[in-house]
Amino acid sequence: HTIRDIRKGDSYEYPIVKIGTQYWMREDLCATAYRNGTTLNKKTQLGEGPGYFRPQSTEIYFYNGEAVLEGELAPAGWKIPDSDDWQALKEYIKDDASILKTGEWEVLKEGDTIDSGSNLTDFSAYPVGIWGAGKNISPKQLVCYWTLNETENSIPEQSISFTGSSVKFSVAATHVKNETYYKAFSIRCIKE
């Protein structure tokens, strides 16, 4: 099964997967415009307003928290997961993040044990890293996903991450240290 997302004349199909009672996109969001058609600006530095970030020669997209808070990033009928959505997924898979992970993972710190994952759920979390300091940081070592409380239009202080060093769910701070602006993470949407 797939969903079709059409924005500004561009069409993108995302495969979907059911895990427990939840329906998730099996790929990270790849939008360059909001659902209403407003262009989302490509950025290279954090702290310069809402935007997306894309390392050269890749199909990887990161979005800063400012873009997430603008709304309308998720395809119609879908949303950026809230803390309860992530908690329900965590409980259903018994905190075994390895069954969500796929691709070539590396450890965060030397001496850590590697967990490459089995992707038994078909969630397909790849270790794409995050965006910061004008570049892709920690590729092959982690992936961080946005969490959004749509009711309050707020982002929690920490969001979900998976690392090559752990079979468990992890968390990552959403703000850049000692700054008022947000980091740039991947977006994985869930059906409303």
Predicted segment positions?
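Conserved positions within compact, well-structured domain cores
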Residues: 1-192
